[in-house]
Swiss-Prot record:
InterPro entries given in the database record: Ribosomal_uL3 (IPR000597), Ribosomal_uL3_bac/org-type (IPR019927), Ribosomal_uL3_CS (IPR019926), Transl_B-barrel_sf (IPR009000)
Similarity section: Belongs to the universal ribosomal protein uL3 family.
Protein name as catalogued: Large ribosomal subunit protein uL3
Record-annotated membrane-spanning stretches: none
Source organism: Clostridium perfringens (strain 13 / Type A)
Record-linked Pfam families: Ribosomal_L3 (PF00297)
Gene Ontology MF terms: rRNA binding; structural constituent of ribosome
Keyword ATP-binding: no
Keyword rRNA-binding applies: yes
Region (Disordered): 129-153
Length: 209
Protein backbone atom coordinates (compact mmCIF):
# COMPACT_ATOMS: atom_id res chain seq x y z
CA UNK A 1 0.00 0.00 0.00
CA UNK A 2 1.32 3.42 -0.96
CA UNK A 3 1.74 5.94 1.87
CA UNK A 4 2.37 9.68 1.66
CA UNK A 5 2.08 12.69 3.95
CA UNK A 6 3.06 16.37 3.95
CA UNK A 7 5.00 17.79 6.88
CA UNK A 8 7.14 20.60 8.25
CA UNK A 9 10.79 20.17 9.16
CA UNK A 10 11.33 21.08 12.82
CA UNK A 11 15.08 20.44 13.13
CA UNK A 12 17.67 17.81 14.00
CA UNK A 13 18.48 16.09 17.28
CA UNK A 14 19.81 12.74 18.45
CA UNK A 15 18.35 9.77 20.29
CA UNK A 16 19.83 6.58 21.72
CA UNK A 17 18.90 3.02 20.73
CA UNK A 18 18.59 0.08 23.16
CA UNK A 19 22.37 -0.53 22.87
CA UNK A 20 23.23 3.06 23.79
CA UNK A 21 24.32 4.04 20.29
CA UNK A 22 23.60 7.60 19.12
CA UNK A 23 21.21 7.96 16.16
CA UNK A 24 21.05 11.38 14.44
CA UNK A 25 17.43 12.11 13.54
CA UNK A 26 15.37 14.82 11.87
CA UNK A 27 12.16 15.83 13.62
CA UNK A 28 9.23 16.37 11.23
CA UNK A 29 5.77 17.62 12.16
CA UNK A 30 3.79 15.47 9.70
CA UNK A 31 0.08 16.05 9.22
CA UNK A 32 -2.69 15.92 9.98
CA UNK A 33 -3.40 16.29 6.27
CA UNK A 34 -6.88 16.33 4.77
CA UNK A 35 -8.06 14.89 1.43
CA UNK A 36 -9.28 17.88 -0.61
CA UNK A 37 -9.97 16.14 -3.93
CA UNK A 38 -10.17 12.60 -5.29
CA UNK A 39 -9.26 11.85 -8.91
CA UNK A 40 -10.20 8.65 -10.74
CA UNK A 41 -9.52 7.08 -14.12
CA UNK A 42 -13.14 7.67 -15.16
CA UNK A 43 -13.12 11.43 -14.50
CA UNK A 44 -9.45 12.45 -14.79
CA UNK A 45 -7.65 9.63 -16.60
CA UNK A 46 -5.65 8.52 -13.55
CA UNK A 47 -6.09 7.68 -9.86
CA UNK A 48 -4.83 10.21 -7.31
CA UNK A 49 -5.75 12.14 -4.20
CA UNK A 50 -5.08 15.83 -3.54
CA UNK A 51 -3.99 16.50 0.03
CA UNK A 52 -3.86 19.75 2.00
CA UNK A 53 -1.61 20.64 4.95
CA UNK A 54 -1.24 23.63 7.27
CA UNK A 55 -3.80 26.25 8.26
CA UNK A 56 -4.14 29.48 6.26
CA UNK A 57 -5.88 32.80 6.93
CA UNK A 58 -8.80 33.63 4.67
CA UNK A 59 -7.35 36.97 3.49
CA UNK A 60 -4.37 35.14 1.94
CA UNK A 61 -6.51 32.93 -0.33
CA UNK A 62 -7.87 33.98 -3.72
CA UNK A 63 -11.46 33.34 -4.81
CA UNK A 64 -10.91 30.26 -7.05
CA UNK A 65 -8.94 28.45 -4.35
CA UNK A 66 -11.52 29.41 -1.72
CA UNK A 67 -14.18 27.81 -3.90
CA UNK A 68 -12.03 24.68 -4.27
CA UNK A 69 -11.88 24.22 -0.50
CA UNK A 70 -15.55 25.12 -0.05
CA UNK A 71 -16.55 22.45 -2.58
CA UNK A 72 -14.58 19.88 -0.57
CA UNK A 73 -16.06 21.14 2.70
CA UNK A 74 -12.65 21.50 4.37
CA UNK A 75 -10.88 24.45 5.99
CA UNK A 76 -8.31 26.50 4.05
CA UNK A 77 -4.90 24.83 3.69
CA UNK A 78 -1.50 26.38 2.99
CA UNK A 79 0.01 23.52 0.95
CA UNK A 80 -1.66 21.31 -1.67
CA UNK A 81 0.02 18.20 -3.08
CA UNK A 82 -1.22 15.41 -5.30
CA UNK A 83 -0.28 11.77 -4.77
CA UNK A 84 -0.85 8.95 -7.26
CA UNK A 85 -2.56 6.08 -5.44
CA UNK A 86 -3.73 2.64 -6.54
CA UNK A 87 -6.23 2.36 -3.65
CA UNK A 88 -8.12 5.63 -4.20
CA UNK A 89 -11.39 3.87 -3.31
CA UNK A 90 -10.18 3.71 0.32
CA UNK A 91 -10.10 7.53 0.56
CA UNK A 92 -12.94 10.05 0.70
CA UNK A 93 -12.87 13.85 0.51
CA UNK A 94 -12.48 15.18 4.05
CA UNK A 95 -10.58 12.13 5.35
CA UNK A 96 -7.56 12.88 7.54
CA UNK A 97 -4.15 11.35 6.91
CA UNK A 98 -2.14 11.21 10.12
CA UNK A 99 1.44 10.36 10.97
CA UNK A 100 0.49 6.90 12.26
CA UNK A 101 -0.03 5.81 8.64
CA UNK A 102 3.72 5.06 8.84
CA UNK A 103 5.34 2.50 11.14
CA UNK A 104 8.69 2.29 12.91
CA UNK A 105 11.24 0.71 10.57
CA UNK A 106 9.53 1.89 7.36
CA UNK A 107 11.85 3.07 4.59
CA UNK A 108 10.84 6.47 3.20
CA UNK A 109 11.86 9.01 0.57
CA UNK A 110 11.77 12.65 1.72
CA UNK A 111 11.40 15.50 -0.78
CA UNK A 112 11.84 19.22 -0.15
CA UNK A 113 13.47 22.40 -1.46
CA UNK A 114 17.16 22.51 -0.54
CA UNK A 115 18.64 25.47 1.34
CA UNK A 116 19.43 28.38 -0.99
CA UNK A 117 23.08 29.48 -0.97
CA UNK A 118 22.80 32.42 -3.38
CA UNK A 119 25.39 33.09 -6.10
CA UNK A 120 28.45 30.89 -5.56
CA UNK A 121 31.70 30.21 -7.37
CA UNK A 122 32.85 26.93 -8.88
CA UNK A 123 34.80 25.83 -5.77
CA UNK A 124 31.75 25.82 -3.48
CA UNK A 125 29.17 24.98 -6.16
CA UNK A 126 30.98 22.21 -8.07
CA UNK A 127 33.84 21.25 -5.72
CA UNK A 128 36.45 22.53 -8.21
CA UNK A 129 40.12 22.68 -7.23
CA UNK A 130 41.57 26.09 -6.42
CA UNK A 131 44.88 27.45 -7.62
CA UNK A 132 48.05 27.89 -5.53
CA UNK A 133 47.68 30.40 -2.69
CA UNK A 134 51.44 31.04 -2.49
CA UNK A 135 53.33 34.25 -3.29
CA UNK A 136 53.54 35.01 -7.00
CA UNK A 137 50.44 33.09 -8.06
CA UNK A 138 47.74 35.15 -9.75
CA UNK A 139 45.25 32.28 -9.94
CA UNK A 140 43.43 31.47 -6.71
CA UNK A 141 39.66 30.87 -6.91
CA UNK A 142 38.89 31.89 -10.51
CA UNK A 143 36.85 29.49 -12.71
CA UNK A 144 39.74 28.86 -15.13
CA UNK A 145 39.30 27.81 -18.75
CA UNK A 146 35.75 27.68 -20.12
CA UNK A 147 36.69 25.93 -23.38
CA UNK A 148 38.85 26.15 -26.50
CA UNK A 149 39.19 29.36 -28.52
CA UNK A 150 38.74 29.34 -32.33
CA UNK A 151 37.26 25.85 -32.43
CA UNK A 152 34.49 25.44 -31.25
CA UNK A 153 34.35 29.22 -30.56
CA UNK A 154 31.76 28.73 -27.84
CA UNK A 155 31.28 27.41 -24.35
CA UNK A 156 29.61 24.00 -24.28
CA UNK A 157 26.24 23.48 -22.66
CA UNK A 158 26.28 22.32 -19.03
CA UNK A 159 29.76 23.71 -18.42
CA UNK A 160 30.22 23.94 -14.67
CA UNK A 161 30.30 27.66 -13.93
CA UNK A 162 29.48 30.07 -11.09
CA UNK A 163 25.79 30.67 -10.49
CA UNK A 164 22.82 30.29 -8.16
CA UNK A 165 23.32 27.38 -5.78
CA UNK A 166 20.65 25.49 -3.86
CA UNK A 167 16.89 26.21 -3.64
CA UNK A 168 16.12 23.19 -5.82
CA UNK A 169 13.68 20.31 -5.42
CA UNK A 170 15.69 17.55 -3.75
CA UNK A 171 14.82 14.02 -2.67
CA UNK A 172 16.77 11.88 -0.21
CA UNK A 173 16.08 8.17 -0.68
CA UNK A 174 15.78 5.20 1.65
CA UNK A 175 15.69 6.88 5.06
CA UNK A 176 14.42 4.97 8.07
CA UNK A 177 11.53 5.90 10.37
CA UNK A 178 12.95 5.65 13.90
CA UNK A 179 10.10 6.86 16.09
CA UNK A 180 6.50 8.07 15.77
CA UNK A 181 4.57 10.25 18.24
CA UNK A 182 0.95 10.29 17.00
CA UNK A 183 -0.33 12.49 19.84
CA UNK A 184 2.07 15.27 18.73
CA UNK A 185 1.98 14.53 14.96
CA UNK A 186 5.76 14.00 15.11
CA UNK A 187 7.88 11.54 13.14
CA UNK A 188 11.63 11.02 13.66
CA UNK A 189 13.59 10.09 10.54
CA UNK A 190 17.16 8.80 10.67
CA UNK A 191 19.65 11.19 9.04
CA UNK A 192 19.24 14.57 7.37
CA UNK A 193 16.53 15.74 4.98
CA UNK A 194 16.45 18.64 2.48
CA UNK A 195 15.59 22.21 3.32
CA UNK A 196 15.70 24.65 6.23
CA UNK A 197 13.83 24.37 9.52
CA UNK A 198 10.11 25.17 9.01
CA UNK A 199 10.43 24.09 5.36
CA UNK A 200 7.69 21.95 3.82
CA UNK A 201 8.61 18.34 3.05
CA UNK A 202 6.83 15.34 1.54
CA UNK A 203 7.33 11.86 3.02
CA UNK A 204 6.55 8.82 0.83
CA UNK A 205 7.20 5.08 0.77
CA UNK A 206 10.69 4.42 -0.53
CA UNK A 207 10.75 3.45 -4.21
CA UNK A 208 13.86 1.33 -3.63
CA UNK A 209 12.82 -0.44 -0.42
Amino acid sequence: MKKAIIGKKVGMTQIFDENGRVIPVTVVEAGPCVVVQKKTVETDGYDAIQVGFGELREKLVNKPRKGHFAKAGVSLRRTLKEFRMEDVANYNVGDEIKVDTFEIGDKVDVSGVSKGKGFQGTIKRWNASRGPMSHGSKFHRAPGSMGAASDPSRTFKNKRMPGHMGAKNTTVLNLEVVKIMPEKNIILIKGGIPGPNKGTVVIRNSVKA
